[in-house]
């Protein structure tokens, strides 16, 4: 049986993350130590002991999520069998490139730390907002965004196309608020404002792109052992030379998660799916996108023990 790997993005960070993994699996501890060395700081201590307010800052949360994912990857890598593709949600795409063998984990940690810093700076220069729209189709959400942008003379876009009935919108605060109102008028069940430090995956992140391109250009990407599905295009990226372009484009482009999952399911209809990292959010989304898919979330020591014993 072939395997598809999924890697989560920001939002699943919490104090105590990876502590059970490090205590149970030497490979996980070694991975965390290598990332601490690369960042020249004890990210591990912040993940284990907090404070939560500091861990939640985007330039800490992003490398923390990546560290968790690649620590799990280090534990399961020799037990995965035939991995045919990987995808990661937003910053999770960096973890996917690590899994492919094209990017070393310490280099990936430095990249996402820089990515978080640049995104924070862009958010401070032009404050933005994001909101999750539940229970409304993507086309209706996109229509509400277009109308909301016109009415407020601002920017708001569908930023994360997470499932057929869950879309995150992003942009100027007034425009996001108005688009959310229009979504509710169109029948959305709920519109939930998100706690974020900027309008991620929208044109408001444009000031961060050049700095990220510079960091990506200074990073070596090798040839991947299997393709990575890019958020920005939902296409299969099969060479390391393309990685920098798709990762830079991701900052201002929507996360095309629904299309990505459908493309993977079409190419690999009999695959087993594994989500490596904290939270298990992608496992839930996959069931709404590809109901027949079987996905196992592996983020804790107990989950790994159960999976390895099966």
What are these model-predicted stretches?
Residues 10-12, 37-41, 100-254:
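Alpha/beta catalytic cores of group-transfer enzymes, especially the acyltransferase/condensing modules
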Residues 203-206, 286, 308:
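Short secondary-structure transition/capping segments
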Residues 258-261:
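Polyanion-binding loop/helix "lid" in catalytic or ligand-binding cores
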Residues 264:
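Small/polar (Gly/Ser/Thr/Ala-rich) solvent-exposed segments
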Residues 267-269:
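Long, low-complexity C-terminal extensions of enzymes
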Residues 154-156, 271-274:
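Glycine-rich, flexible loop segments associated with nucleotide phosphate handling
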Residues 148, 306-310:
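Short amphipathic alpha-helix with an adjacent loop that forms part of the alpha/beta core around
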Residues 1-142, 194, 272-306:
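FabD-like malonyl-/acyl-CoA
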């Amino acid at each position: 049986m072939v395997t598809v790997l999924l890697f989560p993005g920001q939002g699943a960070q919490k104090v105590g993350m990876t502590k059970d993994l490090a205590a149970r699996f030497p490979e996980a501890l070694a991975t965390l130590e290598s990332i601490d060395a690369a960042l020249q700081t004890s990210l591990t201590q912040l993940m284990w002991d907090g404070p939560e307010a500091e861990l939640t800052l985007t330039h800490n949360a992003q490398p923390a999520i990546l560290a968790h994912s690649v620590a799990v990857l280090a534990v399961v890598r020799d037990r995965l069998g035939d991995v045919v593709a990987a995808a990661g949600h937003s910053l999770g795409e960096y973890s996917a490139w690590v899994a492919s063998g094209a990017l070393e984990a310490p280099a990936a940690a430095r990249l996402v730390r820089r990515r978080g810093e640049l995104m924070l700076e862009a958010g401070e220069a032009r404050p933005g907002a994001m909101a999750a729209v539940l229970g409304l189709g993507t086309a209706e959400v996109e229509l509400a965004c277009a109308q909301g942008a016109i009415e407020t003379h601002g920017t708001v876009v569908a930023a994360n196309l997470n499932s057929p009935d869950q879309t995150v919108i992003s942009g100027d605060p007034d425009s996001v608020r108005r688009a959310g109102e229009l979504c509710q008028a169109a029948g959305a069940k709920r519109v939930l404002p998100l706690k974020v430090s900027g309008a991620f995956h929208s044109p408001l992140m444009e000031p961060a792109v050049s700095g990220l391109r510079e960091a990506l250009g200074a990073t070596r990407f090798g040839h991947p052992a299997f393709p990575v599905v890019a958020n920005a295009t939902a296409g299969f990226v099969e060479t390391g030379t393309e990685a920098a372009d798709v990762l830079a484009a991701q900052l201002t482009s929507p996360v095309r998660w629904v299309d990505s999952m459908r493309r993977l399911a079409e190419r690999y209809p009999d695959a087993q799916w594994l989500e490596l990292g904290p939270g298990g959010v992608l496992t839930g989304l996959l069931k709404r996108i590809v109901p027949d898919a079987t996905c196992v979330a592996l983020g804790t020591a107990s989950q790994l023990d159960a999976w390895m014993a099966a």
